[in-house]
A protein has these predicted regions:
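N-terminal amphipathic alpha-helix/helix-capping segment at the start of soluble metabolic enzymes
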Residues: 1-20, 69-70, 74
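Catalytic alpha/beta core domains of metabolic enzymes, predominantly
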Residues: 12, 116-250, 262-265
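Active-site mouth loops of central-metabolism enzymes
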Residues: 17-34, 58-60, 81-87, 107-108, ...
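Hydrophobic faces of well-ordered beta-strands that scaffold small-molecule active sites
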Residues: 17-23, 45-49, 83-85, 104-106, ...
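Glycine-rich, proline-tolerant flexible connector loops at the mouths of alpha/beta enzymes
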Residues: 48-67, 230-239, 295-306
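Alpha-helix-loop-beta-strand connector modules within alpha/beta enzyme cores
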Residues: 61-85, 120-130, 180-195, 241-260, ...
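Catalytic beta/alpha-barrel core
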Residues: 64, 80-93, 102-117, 129-141, ...
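Domain-level signature for soluble enzymes in the chorismate/prephenate branch of the shikimate pathway
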Residues: 260-351
Length: 351
């Protein structure tokens, strides 16, 4: 699959960051127009608003529906901004295109459902409308890529992605964990893909929008999708993660865009050291696996079980203590040792 850079009317190919902003939900004509006009004054080129809102639980505000589409059309006419909304069904696609919507995005819950993605791909077949795909709710890169493949296979080639974070049971700082390594790997596989970050959904609160946006810029994301409302405290959905157009403007002006520069000699030297250390790590892991295989042979010959829980717990505890003494994060050490142990078990089971 080949993915090229997203093409948006009126936006230069090298423009960065591309800002998509607007309320979580279109609630009324007045709210939509007031917010859009303030955003347009500040140079935002793409206005977003949810018309249909798939909620985690029933009973919450689920959007105004098709009655809100003329409001977006009016935004386009009065401000010149492109307008975007979320679609989750083929009917949404048909209604949005009929109303002249310029850009669509597919939400996290929909992206996680191959049946829904195929329905949308079929509905979009033959169109050239830009489509952004949010990451699935669970951290599965292949599922994300699969959603993109369904669109591309249907001839929908003007596509990009939005990182909105991943759902976890144990929520601490973030509403949805960014897990930056996943979009980084996506970029590695598809270097030309256009990537947006949604700091509103990642952070879940206003005060996290600025730092998450800066992190995204440092990681060379192409743009940001940020929820902005003329009166966020009165918003009917996700009030805590929306900011006023004025605060958005201030936030964007504070972003630092680091230019691409040639690697300095010092960094080259340090990277060479990293390469050498990685080689040593792999050599040591290979040696460990050989010893693990010998232990496995002994267990097999003496009718001993492969998995010995006491030994495993001892390894985890002692290695965590060793790691802490070396200023290594405990969870990081646990993750490494668990992966190494799983490989050892796999080797011994194969004997």
């Amino acid at each position: 699959m080949e993915i090229n850079r997203l093409v948006l009317p009126g936006i230069e190919a090298d423009e960065r960051p591309i800002i998509i902003a607007g309320p979580c939900s279109a609630e009324s004509r007045e709210q939509v127009l007031n917010t859009a006009q303030e955003l347009a004054k500040n140079g935002v080129k793409v206005f977003r608003a949810g018309i249909w809102k798939p909620r985690t639980k029933p009973g919450g505000f689920e959007g105004v529906g098709t009655v809100g589409l003329p409001w977006l059309k009016e935004v386009k006419q009065k401000t010149g901004m492109l307008v975007a909304t979320e679609v989750a069904t083929a009917a949404h696609v048909f209604e949005a295109i009929k109303a002249g919507i310029d850009m669509l995005w597919i939400g996290a819950r929909t992206a996680a459902n191959p049946f829904a993605m195929q329905e949308l791909a079929d509905a979009l077949r033959g169109t050239d409308i830009p489509v952004l795909v949010k990451n699935p709710v669970n951290p599965d890169l292949e599922l994300w890529i699969g959603a993109l493949e369904r669109l591309v296979n249907a001839g929908v080639n003007n596509v990009g992605v939005i990182l909105r974070g991943f759902s976890t049971y144990d929520q601490k700082i973030y509403r949805n964990l960014p897990l930056w390594h996943i979009p980084i790997e996506l970029r590695r596989r598809y270097p030309n893909i256009t990537m947006f970050c949604d700091p509103s959904h990642i952070g879940g609160k206003r005060e996290l929008i600025a730092p998450i946006s800066q992190q995204a810029m440092d990681l060379k994301f192409d743009g940001l999708m940020i929820e902005s409302h003329c009166n966020p405290d009165e918003a009917l959905s996700d009030a805590k993660q929306q900011i006023t157009p004025q605060i958005l403007d201030f936030t964007l002006k504070m972003l630092v865009l680091r230019e691409n520069v040639q690697t300095t000699e010092n960094i080259s030297v340090l990277r060479k050291q990293i390469d050498e250390i990685d080689e040593q790590l792999l050599t040591i892991l290979a040696k460990r696996n050989r010893i693990s295989r010998e232990i496995g042979m002994y267990k097999k010959e003496n009718n001993m079980p492969v998995l010995q829980t006491g030994r495993y717990n001892e390894i985890l505890e002692k290695r965590a203590q060793m790691g802490e003494a070396m200023n290594l994060d405990k969870e990081f050490v646990f993750a490494i040792m668990k992966a190494i142990h799983e490989e050892s078990v796999k080797i011994q089971l194969a004997l």
